[in-house]
Curated annotation (Swiss-Prot):
This is Non-structural protein 1. Residues 217-237 have a biased composition (Basic residues). Residues 205-237 are annotated as: Disordered. The gene is NS. Upon interferon induction, ISGylated via host HERC5; this results in the impairment of NS1 interaction with RNA targets due to its inability to form homodimers and to interact with host EIF2AK2/PKR. One of its GO terms (cellular component) is host cell cytoplasm. Inhibits post-transcriptional processing of cellular pre-mRNA, by binding and inhibiting two cellular proteins that are required for the 3'-end processing of cellular pre-mRNAs: the 30 kDa cleavage and polyadenylation specificity factor/CPSF4 and the poly(A)-binding protein 2/PABPN1. In turn, unprocessed 3' end pre-mRNAs accumulate in the host nucleus and are no longer exported to the cytoplasm. Cellular protein synthesis is thereby shut off very early after virus infection. It comes from Influenza A virus (strain A/Korea/426/1968 H2N2). Residues 1-73 are annotated as: RNA-binding and homodimerization.
Amino acid sequence: MDSNTVSSFQVDCFLWHVRKQVVDQELGDAPFLDRLRRDQKSLRGRGSTLDLDIEAATRVGKQIVERILKEESDEALKMTMASAPASRYLTDMTIEELSRDWFMLMPKQKVEGPLCIRIDQAIMDKNIMLKANFSVIFDRLETLILLRAFTEEGAIVGEISPLPSLPGHTIEDVKNAIGVLIGGLEWNDNTVRVSKTLQRFAWRSSNENGRPPLTPKQKRKMARTIRSKVRRDKMAD
């Protein structure tokens, strides 16, 4: 096992512990608490993959951080903070929408890279809006926290979430997963729109109906689907 992988996990465990203390003292806001919960799931997945105990890793991580801080000068810390780009946390969903439990009548689950897509295939002929909470850096989506699909009545019918065991994803991973989710929902004659916030930072462009532009891969898949449907209709006639 790579030593850098282990030490990175140990430091992440300790930093999560520090952030948990901030929340326990009621010093964290809603986005801070949201990230804490998501990172907890990620650490559990990484710990299982690496076969490392989180409590023991936290203690070692503390020693690593203390050693670094002891060697770090105030001037170097100021320079690091000044040169680091700042990310922003954007929310389409409320805390209630983000944390609400939901179930599927006809569940379908697919893994697309480091992201998990869940769709309720029982949903038909609905107007659906995709909302997401995510971080942005350089005016581009950086990290997806959670994306959910809502009907006009407020029911959750789909979801995209990072896999705890595979931390890290790109904007292309997110766009591909959204394409899969939209395709699955539209297959049952649902009309799907994407929130303006997500359109802006994931695509920087969109159709007037709120649907993001299709990638070449999605266009080819849609063309095959249409041809297949036309053939079935002709056979039925």
